[in-house]
Swiss-Prot record:
Function: Catalyzes the phosphorylation of 5-dehydro-2-deoxy-D-gluconate (2-deoxy-5-keto-D-gluconate or DKG) to 6-phospho-5-dehydro-2-deoxy-D-gluconate (DKGP).
Superkingdom of the source species: Bacteria
Keyword Nucleotide-binding: yes
Name of the protein this chain belongs to: 5-dehydro-2-deoxygluconokinase 2
Listed EC numbers: 2.7.1.92
Biological process, per Gene Ontology: inositol catabolic process
Pathway, per record: Polyol metabolism; myo-inositol degradation into acetyl-CoA; acetyl-CoA from myo-inositol: step 5/7
Primary gene name: iolC2
């Protein structure tokens, strides 16, 4: 059963809010970053990747965010426009803030890392006054990402967007997206992540991310069922807990759980899997699919993206996912 009810006759299916950055992915693999000489530039940031993926699958998508007033900011905005994402609510920073950069290192499929430059970034300067209630109420769903909660004024802008979404019956997806380098402490992170999760209809995160959110509760051990049930006393209708190569489990308020598997593929790198999973999972739910079907789409999309060099450029179409699912071995 799909417990989500989406409004009808909205010009937008999904609005994402938060991080817009640039990924610089290593062209030379099987070597450390110190020995890497060339990189390829892509648009990045978890909410950006998810919005791009959802659009490529057929959703009408918009974005609320802030970019730097320079070549990188213009590159991001133009890329989103070229990929049919509404950019009416992307603001330009006038304070001299810069675009966040993510350099990737691909030593092996199992050994990948990211070097982030996140000082004085434009996306965290998004102000509450730049969040339009009218824009949000025109959408069926809102996607928020945890990184946007790391600092003010972006933090307050996200919470205002959440309030507008709740007011206008907009379904809220929360992609936890925990990046330690943007936070002062795990305690600070847990406080704001918990506040956001309480207002969300669907929460998607890894087991490790949920463990971080539960730091303040002093649980003796991780328990997926206990984690999910905690959020059902608030707004949550679906809680998805991801376990990497072991797949994922989706819990619903009526006590059901659904296990999602993975599809075998030739892995190039590990990053991008979560964003591609989320985009296809959200798409499936918004198309009225049952949760297990939406999870299969997410798993297939993730396997496609980790086999390719980029994240945003590699986001698949519905036809590409269908073709992949016909030939790939599924492990549940």
């Amino acid at each position: 059963m799909n417990p989500l009810i989406f409004k009808e006759d909205c010009p937008l299916d999904l609005i994402a809010v938060g991080r817009l950055c640039v990924d610089l992915n290593a062209n030379e693999t099987q070597r450390p970053m110190e020995a890497t000489r060339t990189f390829t530039k892509y648009v990045g940031g978890s909410p950006a990747n998810i919005a791009i993926g959802a659009t490529r699958l057929g959703l009408q998508t918009g974005f609320i965010g802030k970019v730097s007033d320079d070549q990188m900011g213009r590159f991001i905005t133009r890329y989103l426009q070229d990929n049919n994402i509404n950019t009416d609510q992307i603001c330009i920073d006038r304070t001299g803030a810069v675009t966040g950069l993510a350099f990737t290192e691909i030593k092996s499929p199992e050994d990948c890392s990211i070097l982030m430059y996140r000082d004085n970034v434009a996306d965290l300067n998004l102000d509450p006054t730049e969040v339009s209630e009218d824009y949000i109420k025109q959408s069926k769903a809102l996607l928020i990402s945890g990184t946007a909660l790391a600092k003010s004024p972006s933090r307050e802008a996200v919470f205002l967007a959440l309030e507008y979404a709740r007011k206008h019956d907009v379904v809220v997806f929360f992609d936890v997206d925990y990046r330690p380098y943007t936070w002062q402490s795990e305690a600070e992170t847990a406080v704001y992540y918990n506040l956001a999760a309480e207002k969300s209809d669907v929460i998607i995160g890894t087991r490790e991310e949920f463990d971080m959110m539960e730091k303040l509760l002093n649980y003796e051990e991780s328990n997926d069922q206990v984690t999910a049930e905690r959020w059902f006393s608030h707004h949550a209708k679906i809680v998805v807990i991801k376990h990497g190569g072991d797949g994922s489990i989706a819990y619903t308020r009526d006590g059901q759980s659904h296990r999602g598997g993975i599809f075998k593929t030739k892995v190039l790198k590990t990053f991008g899997a979560g964003d591609s999973y989320a985009s296809a999972f959200i798409y499936g739910l918004m198309q009225g699919l049952e949760i297990p079907q939406a999870m299969r789409l997410g798993g297939a999309s993730a396997s496609i993206v980790i086999s390719k060099h980029s994240c945003s450029d590699a986001m698949p179409t519905r036809a590409e996912i269908s073709a992949f699912m016909e030939i790939a071995e599924e492990i549940v």
